């Protein structure tokens, strides 16, 4: 189960980056 925590945190970071990039794109458009 040691792999569970890193994967969850990685998914959270990925979602944050995606939403951040989407917000930037919406602002510029």
From Swiss-Prot:
<protein>
    <recommendedName>
        <fullName>Coenzyme PQQ synthesis protein A</fullName>
    </recommendedName>
</protein>
<keyword id="KW-0884">PQQ biosynthesis</keyword>
<dbReference type="GO" id="GO:0018189">
    <property type="term" value="P:pyrroloquinoline quinone biosynthetic process"/>
</dbReference>
<comment type="pathway">
    <text>Cofactor biosynthesis; pyrroloquinoline quinone biosynthesis.</text>
</comment>
<feature type="cross-link" description="Pyrroloquinoline quinone (Glu-Tyr)">
    <location>
        <begin position="16"/>
        <end position="20"/>
    </location>
</feature>
<comment type="similarity">
    <text>Belongs to the PqqA family.</text>
</comment>
<comment type="function">
    <text>Required for coenzyme pyrroloquinoline quinone (PQQ) biosynthesis. PQQ is probably formed by cross-linking a specific glutamate to a specific tyrosine residue and excising these residues from the peptide. There seems to be another source for PQQ in this bacteria only.</text>
</comment>
<dbReference type="InterPro" id="IPR011725">
    <property type="entry name" value="PQQ_synth_PqqA"/>
</dbReference>
<dbReference type="Pfam" id="PF08042">
    <property type="entry name" value="PqqA"/>
</dbReference>
